[in-house]
Amino acid sequence: MVRIGNSWDEILADEFRGENYLKIREFLKDEYSHHVCYPSMYDIFNALKYTDYYDVKAVILGQDPYHEEGQAHGLSFSVKKGVEIPPSLQNIYKELQSDLGIPPAKHGCLENWARQGVLLLNSVLTVRAHLANSHKNCGWQQFTDDIIKKLNERDTPIVFILWGANARSKKQYITNPIHYVIESAHPSPLSAYNGFFGSRPFSRTNEFLKSAGIEPVDWRTE
């Protein structure tokens, strides 16, 4: 049985006991024993470990983990300190500077966001090395859709930040009118100029949180 170490254990108890997760677990046992996969098995649930269910103020949905060595550590868009900052995250930092005047960090670790209540959740939590989307059909999508549905049930407001078509497809699960959805193009260099730049997701998140009487996020990462 997986142990997250906070209220997610109770919230997701049925999911972790269910047939879908058992299928995921068997798939991962085989994948991790025969191939290089990311993140480390110990980091798969870091998004949930760092951000308790009842502490979630905002959700930034990613697609699947970075698939090169040393990058993925269980938080969407984030890399460990000392690892080169990927292009999508460089663009996130550019928008953060444009939006709130926060200079780009010298590292790509977003742990500070996670510890303040920003759930950095990928819709697929693992990947085989060098093969983007290689685990997309193993059951993770259903598992993380269930997480979004659980968050939708919360009676305190959450900001859902959906970048790109994959993330925006999850909007169907956000039906509770107390929540706030921010949508735009993905920060990837392929699409950032199609509506990500200039979308001001960070200030808009904080404006909404303050209007709901919730402490805003300090978006600095260092």
Where are these regions (language model features)?
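A non-catalytic structural micro-motif
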Residues: N194-F196
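A polyanion-binding, active-site-adjacent surface
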Residues: V2, D14-L162, N166-S169, I174, ...
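Short, contiguous pre-domain boundary segments
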Residues: G5-W8
